[in-house]
Amino acid sequence: MATFKLVISNPKNGIARQVEISGEEAEKLIGKRIGEEISAKELGLNLTEIFGEEIPADTKLKITGGTDKDGFPMRPDVHGPRRVKILVSRGPGFRPKEKGERRKKTVRGNTISPEIVQINMKLVF
């Protein structure tokens, strides 16, 4: 059974909250990709209770990224749930120290699998 830590951000005020889900709700996230949206009701989340302010019930959550069990970040441009070493010059998982620097880094693909531990999401009103 999968267990995920969801980091849900509210772009209106910049507040982020962490929630842990498991069981059937977590299984609904497996196979989803970065950029896809899912209803908060579908995951059994009460956003008003989590954020402590009134949030509409029909609010959706957009997947923005995540990390796997070993801390490797998910990248939207790597397809599938696999872990690969790619040559990167910018973006998630790499901060160049000098201009034009490229480096080979291990990253996770853009699809959620049971190996993912943390999923970053934002509210879409």
From Swiss-Prot:
Signal peptide: none annotated. NCBIfam families: PRK04290.1-2 (NF003293), PRK04290.1-3 (NF003294). GO terms for cellular component: ribonucleoprotein complex; ribosome. This is Small ribosomal subunit protein eS6. One of its GO terms (molecular function) is structural constituent of ribosome. InterPro entries: Ribosomal_eS6 (IPR001377), Ribosomal_eS6_arc (IPR020924), Ribosomal_eS6_CS (IPR018282). One of its GO terms (biological process) is translation. It comes from the Archaea. HAMAP family: Ribosomal_eS6. Belongs to the eukaryotic ribosomal protein eS6 family. Keywords: Ribonucleoprotein, Ribosomal protein.
